[in-house]
């Protein structure tokens, strides 16, 4: 059998779901997270937030990185910087809110790159941040925004995990790593300017269930709780963080933590890792 077309060297395969979830051209996520269009002034590994940092980190370690995104053009610049630095990378369009899209995308990944060794779920959403103070209570939260939050934080992780678990179980190895935030630790009220975060508790619960089901099969499942704001020009522009830039968390350091989890010896696996700036509060 010949080598996959996108991965002719048969490198280990890392799939990053939501590699550009906050970097949609001219979208509200881009303006919040980055403060402007993605510029050339930042180092490549910091130019596209956590998704970009993860892609560069695993590519640097000799993996073929598959970037999944709803629109291919969202990831083309990121893929180009990985290629120019000697890394191996491909792009596959995927919408976590549509079952058919997930199934089709992973069929392409298996054919063109190979069975994934690492799956990182980094899809994000900002549903509800635009709502005003008089819409703060749950009774005012629009149903369509609720569906968006649930599709991204609950249904999407379930669908993508199903696509990689059979091969990982049969092989007896693999890593599934979920990027989550501090609001996944317990249900909280939604304040003005925040997303509806409680669906993220279900992503955490899924990771815990998968840990119990698949650890014995050699599959390492872990949640990374990012307890704070990820550093970017957009977050640095927030008034509270202009006064306290020490509260920002470096995306490159977060990516290092993901790679550390993947490389752990199976006699000593971490299943949940909480990352907090040294001067920031530790959520509970």
Regions found by a protein language model. Give the residues of each.
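Canonical Rossmann dinucleotide-binding motif of NAD(H)/NADP(H)-dependent dehydrogenases/reductases
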Residues: 3, 7-66
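Active-site loop of short-chain dehydrogenase/reductase
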Residues: 11-13, 88, 115-116, 130, ...
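Catalytic loop of short-chain dehydrogenase/reductase
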Residues: 18, 22-25, 30-45, 141-145, ...
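Conserved mid-core segment of classical short-chain dehydrogenase/reductases
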Residues: 30, 34-36, 103, 124-147
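Rossmann-fold cofactor-recognition segment
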Residues: 84-100
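Catalytic Tyr-X3-Lys loop
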Residues: 139-158, 173
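A short, exposed helix-loop element centered on a Lys and neighboring polar residues
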Residues: 161-162, 208
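C-terminal helical subdomain
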Residues: 216-225, 239-284
């Amino acid at each position: 059998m010949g080598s996959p077309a996108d991965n002719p060297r048969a490198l280990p395969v890392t799939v990053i779901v939501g590699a550009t979830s906050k970097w949609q051209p001219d979208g509200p996520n881009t303006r919040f997270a980055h403060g402007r269009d993605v510029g050339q002034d930042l180092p490549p590994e910091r130019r596209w937030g956590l998704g970009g940092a993860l892609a560069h980190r695993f590519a640097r370690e000799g993996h073929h990185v598959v970037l999944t995104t709803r629109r291919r053009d969202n990831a083309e610049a990121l893929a180009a910087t990985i290629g120019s630095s000697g890394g191996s990378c491909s792009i596959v369009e995927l919408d976590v809110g549509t079952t058919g899209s997930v199934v089709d995308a992973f069929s392409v990944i298996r054919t063109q790159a190979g069975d994934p060794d690492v799956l990182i779920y980094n899809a994000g959403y900002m549903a509800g941040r635009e709502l005003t103070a008089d819409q703060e209570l749950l009774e005012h939260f629009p149903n369509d925004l609720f569906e968006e939050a649930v599709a991204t934080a609950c249904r999407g992780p379930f669908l993508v995990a199903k696509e990689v678990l059979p091969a990982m179980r049969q092989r007896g190895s693999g890593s599934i790593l979920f990027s989550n935030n501090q609001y996944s630790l317990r249900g909280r009220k939604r304040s003005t300017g925040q997303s509806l975060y409680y669906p993220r508790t279900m992503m955490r619960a899924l990771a815990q269930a998968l840990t119990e089901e698949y650890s014995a099969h050699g599959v390492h499942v872990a949640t990374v709780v990012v307890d704070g704001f990820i550093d970017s020009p957009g977050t640095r522009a927030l008034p509270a963080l202009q006064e306290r830039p020490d509260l920002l968390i470096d995306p490159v350091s977060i990516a290092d933590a993901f790679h550390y989890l993947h490389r752990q010896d199976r006699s000593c696996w971490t299943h949940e890792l909480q990352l907090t700036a040294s001067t920031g509060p530790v959520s509970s």
